[in-house]
Design a protein with these regions (language model features):
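Short amphipathic alpha-helical segments enriched in hydrophobics
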Residues: 19, 23-26, 141
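Nucleotide-state sensing region of NTPase/ATPase domains
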Residues: 23-107, 113-119, 123, 181, ...
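Short, charged low-complexity intrinsically disordered segments located at boundaries
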Residues: 46-52, 119, 139-146, 162-173, ...
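Conserved NTPase motor "head" modules and their coupling/switch loops across ABC/AAA+ ATPases, GTPases
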Residues: 1-7, 20-21, 31, 149-222
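Conserved lysine of the Walker
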Residues: 11-12
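Intracellular alpha-helical coupling/juxtamembrane segments of multi-pass membrane proteins
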Residues: 36-39, 130-133, 173
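Long, charged N-terminal accessory/stalk domains
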Residues: 99-100, 106-149, 153-156, 160
Length: 222
């Protein structure tokens, strides 16, 4: 166990944030990379050394105000940030995480998305594809309504993509909650007489979470 301690404003949180950056590709608190770059500078550099049971790793990251971040592991450029999750797994708990209980469902979704992405790298890819399709659909809906229309064949195409990716996302989340229930429930029983039960309640009331049911729901609720 490692404990990092020091006076206020000495950079303790910065160290943890830097480690988290190499696990998830982004900060746990900043909305954009620009917020992580020192005032007056155009870029910032991070580096980390770690190892597993098989080999040692050295990772580097450069953040630029006007461009994408550049990441490499052992000298090999990483094109997709989701790849980082296969090297370094990190779980961060901060005071803000109390929002998991007190906050809105979006807080809990962000926690689940971050955790599931580390367990199943394909989940991150699926989630990214889903969000891109959702943006395209919303843009098309805005255009159609401006023209006084309410349906278009292209909408069904985007609904098909959303249904395909969305059904997979819900399955991943459901599996994660079941796994979390198994382990967290046992820990809760050791420290308390209370029973901990977590339930996954998606906004789409779809019992089988099938792609077909998801598509029908989207077609009916444009």
């Amino acid at each position: 166990t490692n404990v990092i301690y020091g006076d206020n404003a000495q950079g303790k949180t910065n160290i943890l944030e830097a480690v988290y950056m190499f696990a998830g590709g982004k900060s746990h608190r900043a909305k954009s990379d620009r917020e992580l770059i020192k005032f007056g500078s155009d870029f910032a550099r991070l580096s980390i050394a770690f190892s597993d049971s098989e080999r040692d790793y050295k990772a580097k990251m450069q953040l630029r105000k006007g461009g994408k971040k550049a990441v490499s592991v052992n000298g090999v450029h990483i094109k997709k940030l989701s790849k980082l999750m296969s090297y370094l797994n990190v779980v961060m708990f901060s005071p803000e995480d109390l929002e998991l209980v007190k906050g809105s469902p979006s807080c809990r979704r962000r926690f689940i998305d971050s955790s599931v992405s580390q367990l199943y790298p394909n989940y991150f890819v699926c989630l990214t594809d889903y969000n891109k399709a959702l943006m395209q659909k919303n843009s098309l809906l805005k255009q159609l309504r401006s023209a006084g229309k309410y349906h278009d064949e292209v909408l069904s195409v985007w609904n098909g993509t959303l249904a395909e990716k969305g059904a997979k996302i819900m399955e991943y989340r459901k599996s994660f909650i079941e796994l979390l229930n198994k382990f967290a429930g046992g820990i809760q029983e050791e420290i308390s007489t209370e029973k901990l039960v977590l339930e996954y309640a998606p906004s789409i009331k779809n019992q089988d979470m099938s792609e077909e049911s998801f598509f029908e729901y989207l077609e009916e609720h444009q």
